[in-house]
A protein has these predicted regions:
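N-terminal subdomain of nucleotide-sugar transferases
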Residues: 4, 10-59
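A nucleotide-sugar donor-handling region in carbohydrate enzymes
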Residues: 10-13, 59-64, 83, 160-235
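Glycine-rich phosphate-binding loop signature in dinucleotide/nucleotide-binding domains
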Residues: 21-22, 103-110, 214-215, 294
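Active-site and donor-binding regions of nucleotide-sugar-utilizing enzymes
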Residues: 25-30, 35-42, 49, 69, ...
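Structural beta-sheet core signal
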Residues: 28, 54-56, 114, 136, ...
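Donor-nucleotide binding loops and adjacent catalytic segments primarily
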Residues: 59, 67, 204-294
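N-terminal beta-loop-helix "entrance" segment that forms/cooperates
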Residues: 60-76
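A donor-sugar binding/catalytic signature common to diverse glycosyltransferases
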Residues: 114-115, 121-124, 136-137, 164, ...
Length: 318
């Protein structure tokens, strides 16, 4: 398939040409691994019914953070790479809006689909100005913590979306309280159950325990990467002091799948982790979920892991 390179400032947007097949054109925009994971089943189903383009903002593009998930979840590579990461947060957010706007002008989608509350979702600002219908999955989530960057993104995207798809009745009520029309709000549930069930055989077949020398049920799985925990000194110190105490109390390995930013912060701080806390590079979808299914406990500040862990109970894993 021919490829087109379109210059935008000093960055490049790379996209595929699509033939006109008579189908409505849907543009799906992602930028982080939680979006890729949650949307995996949706993306594949959308390709059946729509002329679907998948755009990646580049917000978190690294093989271990993103690329491996396309492989594990049997997803085709993104059709569009925006390379929107800037020198700082402001530049990145500006690039996401600017580059996604240019993509929409070029590809002329009939609708745009985003999920969640990451900075990638801010791409819908351009869609609104271009009068392109916006569909927002995972709408209506609220934590009532105004210090959380995602809380601001949620409010922006919910308000300007044409159709909001909430995971729960609780989230729908938040949308209703905001004054959003009920006829454009739907409770769809989360797509995570389908994603996990579709990949269950591969998850169970993973040999990650053998590779890492871990015994099932006798380790703790740790994920800690959120900005408010890693970049705030007080929270950072409290968190990892608690992790060390946990390692001492339970006397078992704590496997820490460590985000590059978290690893850098630990190195800079000089904080000494307990010898039982094992840092490891980010793992793929099948390996990580196999570890999650068989852990003594999962400790996380992630939004995805608690949801995955709760779903595992439906397939016989407490």
């Amino acid at each position: 398939m021919n490829r087109l390179a379109q210059k935008t400032s000093n960055k490049t947007i790379t996209m595929k040409h699509f033939a006109d097949n008579g189908k409505l054109k849907l543009l799906i925009i992602v930028g982080t691994r939680p979006e890729i994971i949650r949307l995996a089943a949706v993306i594949n189903k959308c390709r059946t019914y729509f002329d679907t383009l998948l755009a990646h903002t580049g917000q978190n593009y690294d093989y271990n953070l993103n690329g491996v998930f396309f492989k594990d979840l049997k997803l085709a590579d993104p059709d569009i790479y925006m390379e929107a990461v800037g020198d700082d947060l402001g530049a990145t957010m500006g690039n996401i809006i600017d580059k996604s706007y240019k993509v929409m002008v070029e590809t002329k989608p009939d609708a745009v689909l985003v999920l969640g509350d990451t900075n990638s979702c801010l791409s819908v600002i351009g869609a609104k100005r271009l009068h392109i219908p916006i569909f927002h999955m995972e709408a209506g989530n609220r934590c009532k913590d105004e210090c959380l960057p995602e809380e601001t993104n949620r409010r922006i995207v919910d308000i300007i979306s044409d159709v909001n798809m909430a995971y729960s009745e609780h989230a729908r009520r938040y949308l209703a309280d905001t004054g959003l029309p009920k006829e454009r709000t739907y409770v769809t549930g989360s797509p995570m159950a389908e994603v996990l069930h579709q990949n269950l055989a591969d998850i169970e077949a993973s040999d990650i325990h053998q590779r890492l020398g871990l015994e099932k049920g006798k380790y703790i799985l740790l994920s800690a990467h959120r900005e408010e925990n890693i970049d705030t000194e007080k929270n950072f110190s409290s968190l990892f002091t608690a992790i060390n105490k946990m390692a001492e109390k339970y006397d078992m390995p704590i496997l820490y799948s460590c985000h590059p930013r978290s690893r850098k912060r630990l190195e800079q701080s000089g904080f000494q982790l307990d010898r039982r806390v094992i840092q490891h590079e980010p793992l793929g979808f099948h390996d990580y979920n196999c570890l999650q299914m068989n852990a003594f406990a999962v400790v996380s500040d992630s939004g995805t892991l608690p949801e995955e862990s709760s779903i595992f109970t439906s397939v016989g894993h407490p």
